[in-house]
From Swiss-Prot:
It comes from the Viruses. The keyword Membrane applies. It is a single-pass membrane protein. Keywords: Host membrane, Membrane, Transmembrane, Transmembrane helix, Transport, Viral movement protein. Residues 90-101 have a biased composition (Pro residues). Belongs to the mastrevirus movement protein family. The chain crosses the membrane at residues 30-50. One of its GO terms (biological process) is transport of virus in host, cell to cell. This is Movement protein.
Length: 101
């Protein structure tokens, strides 16, 4: 090979290794990031909109928002709990007098 033709020849560069046919890590990263962003969006939507909407819908069905209990302990207005406890202190104890009792 003469020196002038050596300038115009390209150097030998090794080619990339063949792919194994699996999922590329960049695709896995994209899916993970998009899933995380979607989860944050759903949580913020719940905080800002859905929680208030649930309270409004339950209040429209006849319950005030103070009575709302989620789960199996919901308030049943048909069978209220009677107040059967006797008061332990007198109803009108009178004025406080220092040095007595």
């Amino acid at each position: 090979m003469d020196p002038q033709s050596a300038i115009y020849t390209l150097p030998r560069v090794p080619t990339a290794a063949p792919t194994t046919g699996g999922v590329s890590w960049s695709h896995v990263g994209e899916v993970a990031i998009l899933s995380f962003v979607a989860l944050i969006c759903i949580y913020l939507l719940y905080l800002w909109v859905l929680r208030d909407l649930i309270l409004v819908l339950k209040a429209r069905r006849g319950r005030s928002t103070e009575e709302l209990i989620f789960g199996s302990e919901a308030v049943d207005r048909r069978h209220p709990i009677p107040n059967t406890l006797e008061p332990t202190a007198p109803v009108h104890p009178g004025p406080f007098v220092p040095g007595q009792g």
